[in-house]
Structure formats: structure tokens, C-alpha cells
Regions:
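Sequence-level detector for tyrosine residue identity
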Residues: 36-37, 50, 64-66, 113, ...
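Active-site or metal-binding loop neighborhoods of secreted/extracellular toxin and effector enzymes
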Residues: 4, 14, 127, 133-182
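Low-complexity, compositionally biased segments
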Residues: 16, 27, 34, 48, ...
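N-terminal capping segments
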Residues: 1-83
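...with weaker cross-activation on analogous glycine-rich loops/strands in unrelated enzymes
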Residues: 64-153
Length: 182
């Protein structure tokens, strides 16, 4: 299969519908609200892990941890990083995609081909974005749910609010996939 070609089957549509439902349910849970907005230092970790476990699968679930932000500069921040979550697909080898721009860190990882979970964090800001993304033939990627600073969810296909944070990395990572540079 050519890396610039996506195969669309009924099971992919069903998977997307399930992700949308799960993410909406997750945002309604007080447990998630408490983890995400709590003063506990691990709130960033717990919220992201909660979403990943709910939206993921037995073969590709995520565990987040804190790590030193740009260690060579001695800076610390709330950074979400994946640990042993990459899933191999026949067409594309899904590896963790990490990018650091100035004081921001981003990554995407497979929840199960072709669905990605992308995260974004800013140094010195205890909040971040987590987004479930799913490619579409029209736009190459689709934001299924975006959990951000105000706990807002974007409607499926709402690419107008897909410009920052996890959305930026999603576009970047899919660009690499489609151009064969990954």
C-alpha cells in the first residue's frame, strides 16, 4: 500500500464513532474533571492517561510520565510522553513522533491504525491539549475530540479550531506519513 493512500472500510467508521462517544463520556465524568483541573502535581499525567485508556485498546494504550524539559538547558515542564505504545501496521510502522519547538513539546502515537492520539504541552503552563485524530480522504486528518484548557470538545470535522497544540502536530505528523518521510 502506498503511504499516501488511505484505505477506508466500515470498521474504521465504527471505530471513529466509538472514539467520539468515549471522549464525550470522558469529559462528563467528574473523575476526569478532578484529575485534569486538580492541584495535584500529577493532574496532567492522570488526565492524559485516563483519556488514553478509555479511547485506546488492549494492544495500544498509553502511559504518560513527567520528564525533564530540554535537559541540556535545565528546564522543567509538564511534558506528556509515551512509553511502549507504538503499534505496527502492515502499511506503516507507527513510531512515537516527538517534536520540540522552543518551549513547547508535541507528540503523536497510534491508538490503533489509523487513529492517532496527539498531545501538546507548554513549559511553565500546567495545562495542555490532548486530541484524538482520525484521517479523512478530504482533509487527511480529522479532529475527533480536543481536550484543552477550557475542556472544550470540537465537533467532528471542525478543522477551524484545529490550528494549535495537538492539532498542529497532527497535521505535521500526517504530512510526514503521506509524503513518505517518516
Amino acid at each position: 500500500m502506498n503511504k499516501s493512500t488511505w484505505i477506508w472500510e466500515e470498521r474504521h467508521d465504527k471505530a471513529r464513532e466509538k472514539l467520539i462517544k468515549v471522549c464525550h463520556e470522558a469529559l462528563e465524568k467528574k473523575d476526569f474533571q478532578r484529575h485534569y483541573y486538580g492541584k495535584n502535581k500529577t493532574h496532567c499525567n492522570r488526565a492524559s492517561e485516563y483519556i488514553a485508556k478509555q479511547c485506546g485498546s488492549n494492544t495500544a494504550w498509553m502511559h504518560y510520565k513527567y520528564w525533564k524539559w530540554l535537559k541540556r538547558k535545565g528546564k522543567l515542564g509538564c511534558v506528556m510522553t509515551a512509553n511502549s505504545i507504538c503499534r505496527r501496521a502492515p502499511e506503516i510502522v507507527g513510531e512515537e513522533i516527538t517534536r520540540v519547538d522552543q518551549n513547547q513539546a508535541h507528540f503523536c502515537a497510534w491508538l490503533g491504525y489509523p487513529v492517532l492520539l496527539c498531545a501538546h504541552a507548554i513549559k511553565g503552563n500546567r495545562s495542555g491539549h490532548v486530541a484524538i485524530v482520525y484521517p479523512t480522504p478530504q482533509s487527511s486528518f480529522l479532529q475527533v475530540c480536543n481536550i484543552g484548557w477550557n475542556n472544550r470538545i470540537c465537533s467532528p470535522g471542525d478543522n477551524k479550531s484545529f490550528g494549535g497544540g495537538a492539532g498542529y502536530l497532527s497535521a505535521w505528523s500526517f504530512y510526514l506519513l503521506k509524503t513518505g518521510d517518516l
